[in-house]
Amino acid sequence: MARGALDWIGAELEALDAKGLRRSLEPIGPAQGPVVQVGGRALVNLCSNDYLGLAADPRVRAAAADAAMRFGAGSGAARLVAGDLPPHGALEARLAAWKGREAALLFGSGYHANAGVPGALVGRDDAVFSDVLNHASIVDGCLLSRAELVRYRHCDVEELAGLLARTRARRKLVVTDAIFSMDGDAAPLRELAELCDRHGAMLYVDEAHAAGVLGPNGAGLAEALGVQDRVDVHMGTLGKALGAFGAYVAGERRLIELLVSRARPFVFSTALPPPACAAALAALEVVATEPSRRTHLFALCARMQAGLARLGFDVARVASPIFPVVLGTEARALAAAAALRERGWFVRAIRPPTVPHGTSRLRVALSAAHDAAQVDGFLAALAAVLPDLPPAGPRRAG
């Protein structure tokens, strides 16, 4: 029975509908992959973060199944109570070695890590400097820390330098995505590391969309740019390129020891399920032994980038498997997604507040499980639907 106290929700949902901003769930099946079943139809999946195609890899699945039989389906408690099982420590050691750090700590999700770690490092007398296009979880974590939140223009090192020079904060924390999830471009980590060294600031890098994809060993953008030792807090996820679930922070041992006591999402959450840890360990082995996956992925990326540029989209700054097809209005993005679906392509419309107003888009994401024919087919389908979209202003990246 509906309760009167919730009657206001109907008007809120109608307002979201009117603005083209109402979200809805859309089940896929039977498993994550380059082609999925959606609404009874087989569609090419271009909106997953499964960048290496490992979510359904038989070795990753088998590792998860074996761990479920050996250690159970769930951990049963927080790590600090009775939930610290062998797969947790094994995965943390492997992640620390992969990132070239002394230690690592697992979190329930990337959102958990970003929401909790800043508050363990800074507080009321401190300041956090955050790229204006950082992920929502970073923004929320900065706000929860109660430090002063200073947002600098996207990748604007010059503006950040001035802000750091003027601050009188006790502690300073610079936070950035490595790869920005809605634009696919890369943070200027070398320059940010230089600024942090100069001003005595801590550098926190979210490698969610870079770990597994970039760098000689797939360890992320910091590895690719040779600045791993200059990043204080390496955050990454297990549910994107690694195809599993969860997140981690890697860094100096003293940092990890502090987070064990002060990172509230770690302290007050049930530990990651053992099958998720085992799946991530198996995925890390694939990353280490099959660099050809990354080579193939970036060959597809070059093909997609060239094709989108020919269609007039600004993708010159893209440095990842993420391509923003910016269409402007919510109506155009929704119409494009619907038209592409009719032609066999599954790509979702991304709208405010996820992206700024006026930059609604299709977020196209490639996987090593895709092939060149699928890239070419999508580009042809996109070219065919563009003329029939509602009118809008010039296309520009967000």
From Swiss-Prot:
Catalysed reactions listed for this entry: 6-carboxyhexanoyl-[ACP] + L-alanine + H(+) = (8S)-8-amino-7-oxononanoate + holo-[ACP] + CO2
EC number: 2.3.1.47
Family matches, as Gene3D superfamilies: Aspartate Aminotransferase, domain 1, Type I PLP-dependent aspartate aminotransferase-like (Major domain)
Disulfide bonds: none
GO molecular function, one term: pyridoxal phosphate binding
Keyword Transferase applies: yes
Binding site for pyridoxal 5'-phosphate: G110, Y111, S181, H209, T237
Pathway: Cofactor biosynthesis; biotin biosynthesis
Modified residues annotated as N6-(pyridoxal phosphate)lysine in this record: K240
UniProt-listed SUPFAM superfamilies: PLP-dependent transferases (SSF53383)
Keywords: Biotin biosynthesis, Pyridoxal phosphate, Transferase
Essential cofactor(s): pyridoxal 5'-phosphate
Binding site for substrate: R23, H135, T354
Superkingdom of source: Bacteria
Keyword presence, Transferase: yes
InterPro entries on file: Aminotrans_II_pyridoxalP_BS (IPR001917), Aminotransferase_I/II_large (IPR004839), AON_synthase_class-II (IPR050087), AONS_Archaea/Proteobacteria (IPR004723), AONS_Proteobacteria (IPR022834), PyrdxlP-dep_Trfase (IPR015424), PyrdxlP-dep_Trfase_major (IPR015421), PyrdxlP-dep_Trfase_small (IPR015422)
Enzyme type, top EC level: transferase
Pfam families, sorted: Aminotran_1_2 (PF00155)
Subunit structure: Homodimer.
Function of the protein: Catalyzes the decarboxylative condensation of pimeloyl-[acyl-carrier protein] and L-alanine to produce 8-amino-7-oxononanoate (AON), [acyl-carrier protein], and carbon dioxide.
Family statement drawn from the similarity comment of this UniProt entry: Belongs to the class-II pyridoxal-phosphate-dependent aminotransferase family. BioF subfamily.
Record-given protein name: 8-amino-7-oxononanoate synthase
Source organism of the structure: Anaeromyxobacter dehalogenans (strain 2CP-1 / ATCC BAA-258)
